[in-house]
């Protein structure tokens, strides 16, 4: 059986209109994005986690933080998030993409794992 490449693509940015730098706000000395990446890392079904951020210079701080924590970063369009996902998928070539937003640090990893099991077992396209 061919192993499926299952990637979590986390969309993130610092330039939120309502709350600037939202993903770097801290809860108990951890940024929201750190909390999220730690949760996602607990999955034994996700092969790789890639954080997709805009190419804008003001996002360099976020890229540095993510890489310091040992995660890959893909940079793409600020305004066209779908294009960012599309281009990242061309680079990483996953069989399945789990889309996660970085401003949601309370993602339940059990739900994510159950979702992965279902999509792989049923051979869903998306």
Residue ranges and their predicted role:
Residues 85-87, 92, 106-126:
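Conserved donor-nucleotide/metal-binding helix-loop-beta segment in metal-dependent transferases, i.e.
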Residues 32-49, 62-64, 68-69:
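A short, N-terminal amphipathic alpha-helix
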Residues 97-98:
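Short aromatic/hydrophobic "clamp" motif used to bind/position activated sugar donors
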Residues 1-20:
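N-terminal nucleotide-binding beta1-loop-alpha1 segment
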Residues 54-59:
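A conserved acidic beta->alpha catalytic loop
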Residues 103:
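Substrate/cofactor-recognition hotspot
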Residues 67-80, 90:
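Conserved donor nucleotide-binding strand/loop of the catalytic core
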Residues 8, 49-51:
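Hydrophobic/aromatic residues located in beta-strands of well-ordered beta-sheets
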């Amino acid at each position: 059986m061919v192993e499926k490449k299952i990637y979590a693509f986390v969309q993130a940015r610092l330039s939120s209109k309502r709350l600037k730098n939202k993903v770097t706000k801290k809860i108990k000395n951890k940024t929201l994005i750190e909390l999220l990446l730690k949760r996602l890392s607990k999955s034994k079904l996700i092969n790789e986690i890639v954080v997709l951020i805009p190419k804008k210079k003001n996002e360099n701080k976020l890229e540095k933080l993510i890489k310091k924590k040992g995660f890959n970063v893909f940079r793409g369009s600020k305004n066209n998030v779908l294009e960012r996902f599309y281009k990242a998928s061309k680079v990483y070539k996953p069989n399945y993409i789990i889309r996660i937003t970085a401003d949601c640090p309370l993602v339940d990893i059990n739900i994510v794992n159950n979702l992965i099991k279902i999509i792989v077992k049923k051979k869903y396209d998306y």
